[in-house]
Each structure stands twice: as structure tokens, then as C-alpha cells.
């Protein structure tokens, strides 16, 4: 049992270390330290889809403030790029740990404990567009494939990803599969192509519903791009044979500028957020235009090592029935 446990841990570390090295080199970012707590009221917390409640923390020696365990570092990263004067084309990545206790299900792919490569870059002049988004997606996908090939060479786990990732807009997907749910659409398109970047998540589609929820103040999901489609964000999805379904590895996008922020908070009824310091800084032009996202570490390890449950590659909390169903949960 001990030998198996140690081997399991070595595999996890190999995937994480290999991916980190490739990501830093190919995406041209520097690894930095990030926070675990966010001060309530400064607008820095990531509100995700807008319904999740963060873990509240009171600090004894700072009695006049309340803090929250971060959901992600989406806003902190952009603030940090501005604070330290990062130039166009430069960026950072954080080994981010977070808690999301309001996950609506604890299952094979969802955990309270979140670990991800949280990255952000300053967009070069004139590149706040769909072409640059796709270029960045292709870079990250190359990192995923290089890591998969390294795992294949070391552990004899056959590589399965296609050489190229396929791009498709959510508007195209709902037209292609009008009778399917969003999740069923993801399964259908990802099974067909193996790896897909689904563009434009957050806005209302022609069927009257969004593909999925997104907070209004980090990704730009409303800007018109091409052929009447909207959104400069999306998800990297791969086909997972272990689960028999599409599997999200990353959510990312070009971040809101002043106009997109005002437009999106009005659409979601979150205009009160504009009173936060972070949002004021953005509206006053103090932040650079950026692109960023999160790449799930445990999800990446789970996929590349062909595990059936995320609890096999991370230590978290699970209902007893989940532990009873999977022998290898850590």
C-alpha cells in the first residue's frame, strides 16, 4: 500500500512540474506568489457565476476587516500586473489554491478544494481580439499535448489528444444541436473532435439562455467578434474516455475593458459593483488590457493519468458514499 501511494504521489508531482515548466516557457509568464485571502469590500474576490458563497475569515489582529478565502485570482492578477508595471506581452502565473464550498455537486470532477494554474498576461497593442484569443488557446493546448507526450514517455500511458484543437462558438453549437442541453452539446462536439475551445460563455444565446453562467466583471462575453457571434472567452474541453464525456480543463478569456464592464454589469443587474475600488480603478483606466484564465491542476493530472475520480489526485473532503465507491481516493 505504501509503495502504491508513493508511486501515485510521484506521478502527480511529475505531471504538475512538467506542465508548469512548459507553461512558463511557452506562454512566457513568470511564476509568482498569490494570496489565499481577499479583503471584503475591495472588489477583488472572484464571484464566479454570482451565486457561490465564499468562506469568511476573521483575523484577530485586523478587527476592522473581514476576509474571504479566494475563489480564484482573476481580479488580483490584473491588479498585480498594473501595480508592478508589467509591459505588453508579459504576464504571470500563480499556483493557486482555493475553496468553493458551494459546489452544487461533489462528484468525479468537482471538489470543494480547487487548485489551478492561474495566469494573466498584458495584451499587446492592437490585439484585443478573437485572433489573439485563439493564438493563446493554441499555445496552452500545445503545453497540454507536450505534457501528455511526456507522461506517455515516462509511464507508458498512450497519448490520445489530437494535434489541433477545434474552435466553435456557442451560437454555432446551439444551432447545430438545438434539441440538446448545453452539457449534451459539449459532449457531442467534443466526442467528435477530441479537443474543443468553446467560444462565448456567459451571454444569452438565440435559444434565450446562456450556455453557462459567468460573472460580469472579468471575462468579456458580450463583445461582437465575427458573423454576429459574441464573446472573447471560452473553455478548453477534451474528450475523457474514462468518464465518457467532455471534460473541462480550462476557463479563460480576454478580460473586460471599461465599456464591456459597464455593459455586462447592467445586463446582470450588478451595477453596485462599480463602487468597489477594483472596479473604479478599471473604469479610470488604471489597469492594462489583459487576457487570463485558470487551468485546473487536479483535473489536468486526473486526465493525463487516466483516473476516474478527481479524489485520486487530490486530498479533499467527500461524502462517505463517495469514499465507499472509489478505492483509491486520497
Curated annotation (Swiss-Prot):
EC number(s)? 6.3.1.1
Q: What main location does UniProt list?
A: cytoplasm
GO biological process, any: L-asparagine biosynthetic process
> Where is it located?
Cytoplasm
- One GO cellular component, as annotated: cytosol
What are the alphabetically sorted keywords of the record? Amino-acid biosynthesis, Asparagine biosynthesis, ATP-binding, Cytoplasm, Ligase, Nucleotide-binding
Domain of life the protein comes from: Bacteria
Q: Write out the GO MF terms.
A: aspartate-ammonia ligase activity; ATP binding; catalytic activity, acting on a protein; transferase activity
This protein's pathway:
Amino-acid biosynthesis; L-asparagine biosynthesis; L-asparagine from L-aspartate (ammonia route): step 1/1
The record's annotation in Pfam families points to: AsnA (PF03590)
| SUPFAM superfamilies in alphabetical order | Class II aaRS and biotin synthetases (SSF55681)
Catalytic activity annotation? L-aspartate + NH4(+) + ATP = L-asparagine + AMP + diphosphate + H(+)
Q: Looking at its record, which EC class is this enzyme?
A: ligase
Q: Which family does it belong to?
A: Belongs to the class-II aminoacyl-tRNA synthetase family. AsnA subfamily.
**What is the protein name stated in its UniProt record?**
Aspartate--ammonia ligase
Q: Which organism is it from?
A: Streptococcus pyogenes serotype M3 (strain ATCC BAA-595 / MGAS315)
